[in-house]
C-alpha cells in the first residue's frame, strides 16, 4: 500500500473511531459530524436520507432505547474505489446498557461508504443487515 493510501486508511479509521466514541457519549451531533449532508443510512425497516435526519433519529434514540449504549465493531475489510471513494465492511452490534457482549442474534454486517471531499474523508452512506445465525 502506498504511503498516501496508508494515510487515507488511517484517516478513514479515525472517522469511524470518532463516530463510535460519539455514540458511546450519546452525542448525535458528534456521531454525524463526519457525514456528508446528503448521506444515507439504511437499516432494516428504515431509510434515513440526510445527515440531519440521521442526527435527529439518533438524538431521539440516545434519549430512549439507546441511552447509555455503545457499539461493538470489527472491521472486516477496507477497499478503495478510485482516488476519492472507499468501502468499509464491518461486523457490528449494539451493546445496550449493562451488556458486555453482543449476542450473535444482535450482530449485523455493515457497509460504510466513504467519499473524500476537499481532502477530508466523510461518510456518504451506511447500510446494515443482520448476520445470519449459524445454521440459517
Predicted features and spans:
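Solvent-exposed loop/turn segments at secondary-structure junctions
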Residues: 48, 94-95, 129-131
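Short helix-adjacent coil turns
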Residues: 19, 26-27
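Basic/polar N-terminal segments that are highly enriched at the extreme N-terminus
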Residues: 1-10, 135-136
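A solvent-exposed, acidic/Ser-Thr-rich amphipathic alpha-helical stretch
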Residues: 9-15, 28-84, 91, 104-105
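Generic short beta-strand segments
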Residues: 89-97
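Short beta-strand edge/turn micro-motifs at domain boundaries
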Residues: 107-136
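A short, structured loop/turn motif at beta-sheet edges
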Residues: 78-87, 114-120
Amino acid at each position: 500500500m502506498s504511503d498516501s493510501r496508508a494515510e487515507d486508511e488511517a484517516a478513514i479509521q479515525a472517522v469511524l473511531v470518532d463516530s463510535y466514541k460519539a455514540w458511546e457519549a450519546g452525542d448525535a451531533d458528534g456521531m454525524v459530524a463526519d457525514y456528508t449532508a446528503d448521506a444515507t443510512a439504511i437499516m432494516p425497516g428504515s431509510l434515513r436520507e440526510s445527515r440531519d435526519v440521521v442526527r435527529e433519529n439518533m438524538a431521539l434514540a440516545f434519549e430512549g432505547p439507546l441511552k447509555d449504549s455503545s457499539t461493538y465493531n470489527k472491521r472486516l475489510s477496507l477497499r478503495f474505489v478510485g482516488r476519492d471513494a472507499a468501502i468499509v465492511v464491518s461486523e457490528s452490534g449494539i451493546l445496550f446498557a449493562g451488556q458486555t457482549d453482543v449476542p450473535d442474534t444482535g450482530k449485523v454486517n455493515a457497509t460504510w461508504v466513504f467519499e473524500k471531499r476537499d481532502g477530508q474523508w466523510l461518510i456518504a452512506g451506511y447500510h446494515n443487515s443482520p448476520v445470519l445465525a449459524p445454521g440459517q
